[in-house]
Amino acid sequence: MTPEHLPTEQYEAQLAEKVVRLQTMMAPFAAPVPEVFRSPVSHYRMRAEFRLWHDGDDLYHIIFDQQTRSRIRVDSFPAASALINQLMTAMLEGVRNNPVLRHKLFQIDYLTTLSNQAVVSLLYHKKLDDTWREQAEALRDALRAQGLNVHLIGRATKTKIELDQDYIDERLPVGGREMIYRQVENSFTQPNAAMNIQMLEWALDVTKEATGDLLELYCGNGNFSLALARNFDRVLATEIAKPSVAAAQYNIAANHIDNVQIIRMAAEEFTQAMNGVREFNRLQGIDLQSYQCETIFVDPPRSGLDSETEKMVQAYPRILYISCNPETLCRNLETLSQTHNVTRLALFDQFPYTHHMECGVLLTRK
């Protein structure tokens, strides 16, 4: 695979290999046959980041080969959304012959939505001033005149200039409802929107018979907790990143959801609060003991759950675990399978043409 060519004819074979690999990894835990969710074979990534290479008068996007670290020129990127590909061309045309915008520009980050909105961040090794802002506003207006719904951001050391806003609002059809998700620049969002819809609908399906309340750790912008709120009496969710918490609060209001409470704290801190080890001012006014959480949802970083959180989640009758790293999932399952059975397993092909796998498991208490 090269950045400008996707081996779409090999998609079925690479997906089949992932299915076999996941089944082999999950065999020690008596997991059921995985439900397999396919990705679109192209234009599936909603975000992309490129370094910029200045070559005389020419200017182009590059990425670095992961093995050799050599530069690879990228004029088109079929893995990314059609909107990103449009913007890649339009941005370079707007910047290439503009000394103010081009000078010391070293990276461009693109974030797009299925609803055809975009935030583009330009990263510089220089101070940004009012002249830069004027030129950037002119570029933004020219892009919008081409029909591109785009917001521009300038970044430099200790500097962030938003011309309008630093977010876009995604709209996803999930289980017969349209969900609105505010996505903030430089914050985590699911990269493959089509796969995100399938993950949300799978999570809805596996919890449709759930009772009581839901606890979610690492909730981000509320991606899962807001979609799952319809299956539970109440949802209590934790997140540590301030921009994500603010986006989650907006998303709660935008989706007219009244049974979700977001707490800004780390999963490890929440474990201490639940166990009565520490008291936190952030929890004033929230009666943790009033929640009857019978399901816990975790979508941890690649490192998986730490040992204390492993112990904490074992206290819940149902554990819904989305993993971007099956190796650490299996490590966690060595502990979790002592008290719970794997009753559902899913493979989400979030990252086609790579060895990476995203998967989901539902565990129920033995």
Curated annotation (Swiss-Prot):
Extract one GO cellular component term from the record.
Answer: cytosol
Short name of one Pfam family = tRNA_U5-meth_tr
Question: Catalysed reaction(s)?
Answer: uridine(54) in tRNA + S-adenosyl-L-methionine = 5-methyluridine(54) in tRNA + S-adenosyl-L-homocysteine + H(+); uridine(341) in tmRNA + S-adenosyl-L-methionine = 5-methyluridine(341) in tmRNA + S-adenosyl-L-homocysteine + H(+)
According to the UniProt record, what class of enzyme is this? transferase
Q: What does this protein do?
A: Dual-specificity methyltransferase that catalyzes the formation of 5-methyluridine at position 54 (m5U54) in all tRNAs, and that of position 341 (m5U341) in tmRNA (transfer-mRNA).
Against HAMAP family, the record matches this protein to: RNA_methyltr_TrmA
The UniProt similarity line reads: Belongs to the class I-like SAM-binding methyltransferase superfamily. RNA M5U methyltransferase family. TrmA subfamily.
Protein's name in the database: tRNA/tmRNA (uracil-C(5))-methyltransferase
